[in-house]
């Protein structure tokens, strides 16, 4: 089973999915005039309470829910594995891919808010399945996407959730995420910055090594062996594409219920999640590990790929405990975030009563996840999660003119008068 899943994943990566996602990222980056430059604006808007419209949760709560699902163990273990397999240069390609992914995240969240649907309890529902059915009239494709979302939520994480449904559940999940995301992020990043400060003398060299090994397979000093450039590119891009979920359609579901009057503004807020997840978290993790490897080369000989970050944190007081607690919080947050996505998809497929059935099955997967091999569980989850990208990107490309036209219009409308005359 494990070999089959591995072969299936590799076939997707090598031929179709990487090209599809990366191509979409680059396309929207170009067509939206490098919308990534509005990240500072998005950060400010995410903490603002001004001009909030209808919706179930605040823009910040929507962002926190998305971050809870995306900032997971992949940011730690995933980067460790990427460095072990693809060399330090993999961090560079992960970072670059994340930057391009910001544009796609904006596009999918824009559509989710633009075509969201108001439910009986006053909250809003949206995402690729609603866009595919109500706008593009592709119901079968919409059902396929929703089924993949439910399946992915079972694999990525399962936990005992409340049986209450409706607005109260969404609000509770959002409240937990608004508290949990800052706590776990500050705890983990605090440990990373402590180590970066401790290894300050070799940090510039670590950054240089990351950039150098992204383009050359020659060995570098400090006990870090060179790796084939193409391996580093493949591994780095794959981690960059999937750690932040840009293009998968999952983040858009939380954006749809945000209290907002503007799809453009919510899109800008939501795209900051990719910035925090990949550009910040993955970059900091990479620099922490590589600088530690340069400072303590002997300690990293014959070490398992998923233990690189643990080894780095072992060089600070209580570091391994800090990392362990961070991992537990990240995993718990992912469970909460993906349970919300699963409920959104189940509600679309079966109505509000279907959410109760989904929650019961979600509980059962706690046991299944414990008895199945970790490789099998994650292999299945990765496949479903990967396949979600296909119908989601279909909706993005078919509605690309709407996304581009309204984004450009909003930019002109809000630009200073001097710029409008140019």
Question: What positions do the PLM features span?
Answer:
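Flexible loop linkers connecting adjacent transmembrane helices
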Residues: 34-57, 81-83, 87-91, 95, ...
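N-terminal alpha-helical transmembrane segments of multi-pass membrane transport
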Residues: 1-69, 73, 83-90, 101, ...
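Selective recognition of specific alpha-helical transmembrane segments in multi-pass small-molecule
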Residues: 100-108, 171, 181-201, 234, ...
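Transmembrane helix-loop junctions in multi-pass membrane proteins
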Residues: 31-36, 74-79, 155-167, 171-175, ...
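Helix-loop-helix module between adjacent transmembrane segments
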Residues: 24, 28-29, 68, 97-122, ...
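Extracellular/periplasmic helix-exit of transmembrane alpha-helices
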Residues: 107-120, 191-209, 221-224, 257-260, ...
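Membrane-interface loop-to-helix entry segments
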Residues: 20-27, 35-44, 164-211, 346, ...
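Alpha-helical membrane segments and immediately flanking helix-loop junctions
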Residues: 53-85, 111-129, 133, 147-150, ...
